[in-house]
């Protein structure tokens, strides 16, 4: 008579509860981040800003994210990550709530700074916590599910920014997004669990995997990080400007442009992320380089589709965008898993913080503003087309990195 409740408790493990709460926070993180691109033409109109100035708003968020990453990573390897995750979620939620009272460009810029610091805290610790709950063989599956929140959150952010912003004013979607973030942060403080560091690690702790100095001589970590950085330059710039591009070049309204990008992102994001994770999981059984190789092919297939979006006939813009996003999302879980697997638990939070610093410093911190500056001097298609160069570089780095992929041991899974 008592076996059913016991079985239920077993199925709803601390790992599963923490995993679900982290997915919820990650979802809201990306909703908040992508409201700005969705509402960008509305905000630009009110502030009378140039494209370069609007790009600088996204740059501001990633710049402060990047600056906060080393300090938060250092803390995450030394103290409990649970209160730090909660603090980060509360900070970005309060900054988002405060957007309702923003009435000038520089006030919005300051808001972006606080959001960046809050997001850096969460973005570093969540993958590290999940890596301590789940062994190497299962991390690709777990992180692929976790990162599904990126396209879903981005799609909801685009849609909220464009549709709600057009109907009720661009401040409304920020206000609506802030409240759930505070609620889930409270739930995480109560129900989230802190796993023992390294409890699920089975890879040998070699010096270049388990020390801070060793990270800089760890080719698997460095190539994964720089390949992702070049990819992030393109993705960050494109995601910041794509609704505006469709509004200007495809003749869509602000609401329809944002809804179109949102719909494509959620379908491609879920399908691409889950299919990429599934293919990589099966490929890993026969080839330990699979995480890097799948990421390489994902980027290679994106390049011609992206060129068609920016420079092809208008009739092919939407189909090509659909194809490009699908291929791009294939690598979300595998590439992030490759980076997490390349380091040991004692320096994992530090490694993730270095990874985040690099992908934002060399990637999306400056790409939205650079694209805006090129657009002011030429047009937005040329600005976005420049990102294709960085996709080529990313593919080359990932192919080189596949030579250094660590061999994974067979391990038992923590079930979800």
Task: Say what each PLM segment does.
Residues 95-98, 106-114, 316-323:
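Paired small-residue
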Residues 48, 80, 101-106, 118, ...:
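Helix-breaking motifs and short loop linkers at transmembrane-helix boundaries and internal kinks
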Residues 111-150:
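Cytoplasmic helix-loop-helix junction between adjacent transmembrane helices
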Residues 67-103:
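Conserved MFS/SLC helix-loop-helix module at the cytosolic interface between two early adjacent transmembrane helices
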Residues 146-190:
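Helix-loop-helix hairpin linking two adjacent transmembrane segments in secondary transporters
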Residues 5-11, 195-225, 249:
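Juxtamembrane intracellular "pre-TM" segments in multi-pass secondary transporters
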Residues 83-97, 291-306:
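Structural signature of the two symmetry-related core transmembrane helices
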Residues 36-37, 219-273, 332, 336, ...:
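Extracytoplasmic gate region of multi-pass secondary transporters
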